[in-house]
Amino acid sequence: MLTILVLVIGGYFVGSLSSAIIVARLAGLGDPRTQGSGNPGATNILRLGSKRLAGIVLLGDALKGFLPVWLAQEVGANAWAVAGVGLAAFWGHLYPVFFGFRGGKGVATGLGVLLGFSWSLALAVLGIWLSIFWCWRISSLSALCAAILAPFLAWWLVPDSAIRFAVVLLAIFLLWRHQDNIRRLLSGQEDRASKQN
């Protein structure tokens, strides 16, 4: 029980390490929460003008979702504990203790968590994201579609009910964090990525 508690708390703290804020500050770009879209994520770093830094942020956010889940599995935690660790890492990204509980929307970190849960699930969700983005060039729309379909894919691809339940919660929180994007999509005001991006 103590090991599980340590893993969950550790997952939250790892998730709280905001890659976008750390990378942007080290690169002299300031706080991404006060620039561009105001979201501390890879898309906003790209919007601020650096593909290289956006790639680093994307990788960092995905890894902080994947690594705690992987570690929990390596130490033999049961499915419910693994699910809890994944959710903790995800919530750490959304509400980071190190950055005033003002975090990102969880797309890359959520994908990292899914990869830890099931590589086939992660690939299926990524495939949906890429397909939608290729058609419409709207990052938020891609994330929303992937989040909506993720629980159904989990039901099909993942045998553990604990992991399925965790994926449902991940999807709900990701949709919740995209409320502003949903409003802009409905009003036709959401930004599209340029062809150069």
From Swiss-Prot:
Chain's role: Catalyzes the transfer of an acyl group from acyl-phosphate (acyl-PO(4)) to glycerol-3-phosphate (G3P) to form lysophosphatidic acid (LPA). This enzyme utilizes acyl-phosphate as fatty acyl donor, but not acyl-CoA or acyl-ACP.
Family stated for the protein in its record: Belongs to the PlsY family.
Keywords carried by this UniProt record: Cell inner membrane, Cell membrane, Lipid biosynthesis, Lipid metabolism, Membrane, Phospholipid biosynthesis, Phospholipid metabolism, Transferase, Transmembrane, Transmembrane helix
Residue ranges crossing the lipid bilayer per the database entry: 4-24, 53-73, 81-101, 113-133, 153-175
Quaternary structure and interacting proteins, as annotated: Probably interacts with PlsX.
Source superkingdom: Bacteria
Membrane protein topology class: Multi-pass membrane protein
GO terms of biological process kind: phospholipid biosynthetic process
Cellular component, GO annotation: plasma membrane
Native source organism of the sequence: Nitrosococcus oceani (strain ATCC 19707 / BCRC 17464 / JCM 30415 / NCIMB 11848 / C-107)
Pathway it works in: Lipid metabolism; phospholipid metabolism
Protein name from the UniProt record: Glycerol-3-phosphate acyltransferase
EC number(s) per entry: 2.3.1.275
Species classification: Bacteria, Pseudomonadati, Pseudomonadota, Gammaproteobacteria, Chromatiales
Molecular functions per Gene Ontology: acyl-phosphate glycerol-3-phosphate acyltransferase activity
PANTHER family xref list: GLYCEROL-3-PHOSPHATE ACYLTRANSFERASE-RELATED (PTHR30309:SF0), INNER MEMBRANE PROTEIN YGIH (PTHR30309)
InterPro entries documented for this protein: G3P_acylTferase_PlsY (IPR003811)
Matches recorded under SMART domains: G3P_acyltransf
Reaction(s) catalysed by this chain's protein: an acyl phosphate + sn-glycerol 3-phosphate = a 1-acyl-sn-glycero-3-phosphate + phosphate
Principal location listed in the UniProt entry: membrane
Subcellular location(s) per record: Cell inner membrane
